[in-house]
Regions:
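Soluble FAD-dependent oxygen oxidases
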Residues: 1-298
């Protein structure tokens, strides 16, 4: 039961993991891609991505990003990783690009070594593994901290046109009214092996999702409090915008403002997790604001 709970319900709830044993796999050929369109194509790109992505093979993972990055014009990108050759990847991407109907302003498809691909996906393009650390973690680390606030949700079906338009408008509003911060929506593809595992086989209950959505805002240390307040208000408004179309939340994107977080994170697995908590940590030693409780009583 403890092993079941730690696969999707861990996160400091039951104890401290002291070691891991990995079943390593051969490293496959890896191809990366980045597609970017002019912002006026954003609604078409997101709508088509939501329809195209579930048709792709397990070897392809992608995300769709609608982001404001401090300029008056937001960005719309689709990026991803493919376990296979660039020529095969290009063939998978071509129908999607054609259906969008607007020529991308960036269309990169290329092979990459696995380690470098993971550095790029981890936000460390151009850095070594050593440099991809905070200086407090490694003296040669070059990363710096930034402040952010984030929320998450899941969708189990493509958004209707009205929902797509609402999110595109929300990013435009962020760029117009709070241009000093970065932020927006990132859709991460699910499906494949994730969804073939039953919802109760592990503590991770989100097994029917089409995509996970992370929506966030970030700012620098010297950002005025009034700007930060505007950014967090935008985030709260984005949650309202998504509410008709999305449900749940990803427990690794812990959200201190999330209401009904127990159900959002754990769904139908919550009662079993509480039972495991009561058995392994009856005194609630591993306690934090959103830790699994020892009882479901109010």
């Amino acid at each position: 039961e403890g092993y079941w709970a730690c696969r999707g319900g861990g996160g400091g709830n039951f104890g401290v993991v002291t070691s891991f044993t990995f079943d390593v796999r051969p490293i496959p050929a890896i191809s990366l891609f980045t597609l970017e369109w002019p912002w006026p194509a954003a609604a078409q790109v997101l709508g088509n991505w939501l329809e195209w992505m579930p048709t792709t093979p397990d070897e392809l993972w992608s995300n769709c990003q609608l982001l404001s990055s401090g300029s008056s014009t937001p960005e719309i990108k689709v990026t991803g990783v493919f376990c296979g050759m660039p020529s095969t990847l290009s063939g998978l991407l071509q129908p999607f690009i054609a259906d969008v109907g607007t020529t991308p302003i960036d269309n990169f498809v290329g092979p990459e070594g696995y380690l470098k691909a993971m550095l790029i996906e981890g936000g460390c393009e151009g850095s070594t593994v050593t440099e991809c650390h905070l200086p407090s973690q490694n003296p040669l680390g070059t990363l710096s901290r930034s402040a952010f606030a984030a929320k998450s949700a899941y969708i189990t079906a493509p958004l209707p046109d009205a929902g797509v338009g609402t999110l595109v408008g929300a990013v435009e509003s962020l760029a117009q009214h709070v241009p000093q911060v970065g932020g927006g929506f990132v859709f991460d593809s699910y499906g494949g092996a994730i969804n073939r595992i039953p919802a109760d086989a592990t503590a991770f209950v989100h097994r029917d999702a089409l995509a996970a959505i992370e929506y966030s805002v970030s700012w620098s240390a010297d950002t005025p409090a009034s700007v930060v307040d505007g950014a967090t208000q935008w985030l709260a408004g984005a949650q309202v915008d998504l509410a008709p179309y999305a449900r749940g939340a990803y427990q690794n994107y812990i959200d201190p403002t999330l209401e009904a977080w127990q159900q959002a994170y754990y769904g139908t697995n919550l009662a079993r997790l509480v039972h495991v908590k009561r058995a392994h940590d009856p005194d609630d030693f591993f306690h934090f604001a959103q830790s699994i409780p020892t009882s479901l009583d109010p």
